Protein backbone atom coordinates (compact mmCIF):
# COMPACT_ATOMS: atom_id res chain seq x y z
CA UNK A 1 0.00 0.00 0.00
CA UNK A 2 1.38 3.39 -0.99
CA UNK A 3 0.82 6.33 1.29
CA UNK A 4 0.53 9.96 0.30
CA UNK A 5 3.45 11.78 1.85
CA UNK A 6 2.71 14.87 3.87
CA UNK A 7 5.57 16.90 5.29
CA UNK A 8 8.01 14.11 4.43
CA UNK A 9 6.38 11.58 6.78
CA UNK A 10 5.95 8.12 5.25
CA UNK A 11 2.66 7.23 6.99
CA UNK A 12 1.40 10.26 8.93
CA UNK A 13 -1.57 8.54 10.59
CA UNK A 14 0.46 5.67 12.01
CA UNK A 15 3.42 7.91 12.84
CA UNK A 16 1.24 10.30 14.83
CA UNK A 17 -0.84 7.69 16.66
CA UNK A 18 2.18 5.56 17.55
CA UNK A 19 4.13 8.67 18.53
CA UNK A 20 1.34 9.68 20.91
CA UNK A 21 1.24 6.13 22.31
CA UNK A 22 5.03 6.30 22.81
CA UNK A 23 4.72 9.55 24.77
CA UNK A 24 1.91 8.11 26.90
CA UNK A 25 3.92 4.95 27.58
CA UNK A 26 6.96 6.97 28.67
CA UNK A 27 4.84 9.27 30.85
CA UNK A 28 2.97 6.32 32.38
CA UNK A 29 6.10 4.37 33.27
CA UNK A 30 7.07 6.25 36.43
CA UNK A 31 3.62 6.24 38.09
CA UNK A 32 3.19 2.54 37.33
CA UNK A 33 6.63 1.67 38.71
CA UNK A 34 6.03 3.79 41.83
CA UNK A 35 2.75 1.97 42.43
CA UNK A 36 4.47 -1.40 41.90
CA UNK A 37 7.22 -0.39 44.34
CA UNK A 38 4.63 -0.11 47.14
CA UNK A 39 4.00 -3.85 46.91
CA UNK A 40 5.96 -6.04 49.36
CA UNK A 41 7.19 -8.32 46.56
CA UNK A 42 9.82 -6.62 44.39
CA UNK A 43 8.78 -8.87 41.53
CA UNK A 44 5.99 -6.37 40.86
CA UNK A 45 8.55 -3.73 39.89
CA UNK A 46 10.44 -6.15 37.64
CA UNK A 47 7.27 -7.37 35.92
CA UNK A 48 5.93 -3.85 35.36
CA UNK A 49 9.32 -2.59 34.16
CA UNK A 50 9.45 -5.39 31.59
CA UNK A 51 5.91 -4.56 30.46
CA UNK A 52 6.54 -0.82 30.17
CA UNK A 53 9.90 -1.29 28.42
CA UNK A 54 8.32 -3.65 25.90
CA UNK A 55 5.58 -1.11 25.21
CA UNK A 56 8.08 1.74 24.81
CA UNK A 57 10.22 -0.35 22.44
CA UNK A 58 7.23 -1.29 20.29
CA UNK A 59 5.92 2.26 19.96
CA UNK A 60 9.41 3.66 19.39
CA UNK A 61 10.12 1.14 16.63
CA UNK A 62 6.72 1.71 15.06
CA UNK A 63 6.96 5.51 15.23
CA UNK A 64 10.39 5.49 13.59
CA UNK A 65 9.32 2.99 10.91
CA UNK A 66 6.16 4.91 9.98
CA UNK A 67 7.86 8.32 10.08
CA UNK A 68 11.03 7.96 8.03
CA UNK A 69 11.45 6.84 4.43
CA UNK A 70 15.23 6.67 4.12
CA UNK A 71 16.07 4.06 1.49
CA UNK A 72 15.12 0.49 0.67
CA UNK A 73 17.68 -1.22 2.90
CA UNK A 74 17.05 1.00 5.94
CA UNK A 75 13.28 0.79 5.46
CA UNK A 76 13.44 -3.03 5.40
CA UNK A 77 15.45 -3.04 8.64
CA UNK A 78 13.02 -0.64 10.30
CA UNK A 79 10.11 -2.82 9.19
CA UNK A 80 11.81 -5.93 10.61
CA UNK A 81 12.45 -4.22 13.92
CA UNK A 82 8.86 -2.94 14.04
CA UNK A 83 7.50 -6.44 13.43
CA UNK A 84 9.91 -8.05 15.92
CA UNK A 85 8.77 -5.68 18.65
CA UNK A 86 5.22 -7.04 18.35
CA UNK A 87 6.46 -10.33 19.83
CA UNK A 88 8.33 -8.40 22.52
CA UNK A 89 5.21 -6.46 23.53
CA UNK A 90 3.06 -9.58 23.62
CA UNK A 91 5.58 -11.34 25.88
CA UNK A 92 5.99 -8.17 27.93
CA UNK A 93 2.22 -8.06 28.40
CA UNK A 94 2.17 -11.66 29.62
CA UNK A 95 5.02 -11.04 32.09
CA UNK A 96 3.01 -9.30 34.87
CA UNK A 97 0.22 -11.85 34.52
CA UNK A 98 2.66 -14.75 34.82
CA UNK A 99 4.86 -13.35 37.57
CA UNK A 100 2.26 -11.53 39.68
CA UNK A 101 -1.13 -13.14 39.10
CA UNK A 102 0.07 -16.72 38.66
CA UNK A 103 3.33 -16.35 40.64
CA UNK A 104 5.40 -19.31 41.79
CA UNK A 105 6.69 -22.08 39.59
CA UNK A 106 3.65 -22.09 37.32
CA UNK A 107 3.98 -18.38 36.59
CA UNK A 108 7.72 -18.59 36.02
CA UNK A 109 7.34 -21.61 33.72
CA UNK A 110 4.61 -19.92 31.67
CA UNK A 111 6.62 -16.70 31.51
CA UNK A 112 9.66 -18.62 30.23
CA UNK A 113 7.49 -20.38 27.63
CA UNK A 114 5.98 -17.11 26.45
CA UNK A 115 9.39 -15.43 26.15
CA UNK A 116 10.77 -18.48 24.30
CA UNK A 117 7.88 -18.17 21.83
CA UNK A 118 8.56 -14.44 21.52
CA UNK A 119 12.21 -15.14 20.73
CA UNK A 120 10.97 -17.57 18.07
CA UNK A 121 8.77 -14.82 16.63
CA UNK A 122 11.67 -12.37 16.68
CA UNK A 123 13.91 -14.81 14.83
CA UNK A 124 11.23 -15.58 12.24
CA UNK A 125 10.69 -11.89 11.52
CA UNK A 126 14.44 -11.19 11.52
CA UNK A 127 15.09 -13.71 8.76
CA UNK A 128 11.72 -14.01 6.98
CA UNK A 129 9.89 -10.69 7.21
CA UNK A 130 7.21 -11.61 4.67
CA UNK A 131 6.46 -15.08 6.00
CA UNK A 132 2.81 -16.12 5.70
CA UNK A 133 0.76 -15.16 8.76
CA UNK A 134 -0.34 -18.77 9.26
CA UNK A 135 3.28 -19.97 9.43
CA UNK A 136 4.32 -17.15 11.72
CA UNK A 137 1.39 -17.68 14.08
CA UNK A 138 2.08 -21.39 14.42
CA UNK A 139 5.77 -20.78 15.05
CA UNK A 140 5.17 -18.22 17.78
CA UNK A 141 2.22 -19.65 19.72
CA UNK A 142 1.16 -18.84 22.42
CA UNK A 143 2.27 -15.22 22.07
CA UNK A 144 0.84 -14.21 18.71
CA UNK A 145 -2.76 -14.12 17.57
CA UNK A 146 -2.32 -12.28 14.21
What are the language-model segments listed below?
Residues 1-8:
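Short, Lys/Arg-rich, polar N-terminal cytosolic tail immediately upstream
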Residues 12-13, 72-85:
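Juxtamembrane helix-capping/reentrant segments at transmembrane boundaries
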Residues 14-31:
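The first (N-terminal) embedded transmembrane alpha-helix
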Residues 18, 62, 83:
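Divalent metal-coordination and catalytic microenvironments
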Residues 30-47, 94-110:
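Helix-coil boundary and interhelical linker segments in multi-pass alpha-helical membrane proteins
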Residues 62-75, 120-131:
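C-terminal ends of transmembrane helices
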Residues 100-105, 125-134:
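Membrane-interface helix caps and helix-loop-helix hairpins in membrane proteins
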Residues 137-143:
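Conserved small/polar residues in nucleotide/adenosyl-binding loops
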Amino acid sequence: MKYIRKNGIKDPGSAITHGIALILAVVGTLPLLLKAAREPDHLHVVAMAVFMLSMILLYLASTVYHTFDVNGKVNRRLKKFDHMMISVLIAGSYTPICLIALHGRTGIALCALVWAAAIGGILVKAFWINCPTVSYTHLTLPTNRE
